[in-house]
Amino acid sequence: MTTTAIDTPTGTAAAQRAQKPLTEGQQSKGTLIGLWAFVTLPFLALFAVIPVAWGGWLSGTDVAIFAVMYVVTGLGITVGYHRYLTHSSFKATRWLRVTLAVAGAMAVQGSPTQWVADHRRHHQYSDLEDDPHSPWRFGNSLKGLTKGMFHAHVGWLFARELSNRARFAPDLLADKDIQKVDKLFGLLSLTTAFAPAVVGGLVTWSWQGALTAFFWAGLIRIGLLHHVTWAINSVCHVYGERPFEMREGDKASNFWPLAILSFGESWHNLHHSDPTCARHGVLRGQIDISARVIWLFEKFGWATNVKWPKVERVKAKMIDRDAQPKLAR
């Protein structure tokens, strides 16, 4: 069975890429309008959660469709876009690579190539001037940090200039499968928003079932996953613990309350200390659902060369040199 790695070349190739501009082109007005719609409408829907549920417009069918869509698209981001496409934490079979890219696109957080370019840029300049979404961008005063938190959480999405894909994601630009998913991003965004309504309507054979499924598994699911993902950029660079060493200036932290909803992404301090590690919650007791999914992929033979944490490497990265870390199983 053929597996594929997403390579991030080093040496001469990396030096040549570093000479390319930081950004390329601008988002079109049409793109910005679509962005406003997919950011604003799910967010506004979140305010209607209690009255809609209280009014009896929530069924077991809605919950089931919501759960399936949240897990599939959430793992598309955490396992697919992030740990695989961005950081090459494992190699994947071709069908798994494409499936993960499609699932990530259906989270409506950007096309695979642009998402990866933004994130690799973030790691290269984490919490420095060229970081696309640092909460410390406007200083550490109350006013500056408040403005920075909004910028890191959602404001940066509306920046006109785009991270240069040729500089930060040349491997994906050369990947024909990923480029096909890029081109289908708009269609996949509409599909993920309205497919729940179709399923809900067919299961209940009613317009009400279609409407409530659209609300819960479409709007609410997209909105919740958006803000959980964005909280990694904002909250997890301000609040939480930092037991692992990072590059000077980097403020990535572990924020346990988001561990389950983010599928393990909120163990952000270790991730910035060791970006290619397939498990972010490396210590015992740290829930990392994404890592468990990768483990399952490995058991089925769909993922190989998984970069699992090792005690010696984890210990070497800990600030407390006397610590004796017990790794998660």
Please tell me what each predicted stretch does.
Residues 89, 238-243:
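Helix-loop boundary elements of multi-pass alpha-helical membrane proteins
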Residues 239, 264-265, 271-272, 278, ...:
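Short leucine-rich amphipathic alpha-helical surface patches
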Residues 1-230, 235, 277-329:
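Non-catalytic, topology-defining segments of multipass membrane proteins
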Residues 169-177, 241-267, 273:
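Active-site-proximal inter-transmembrane loops
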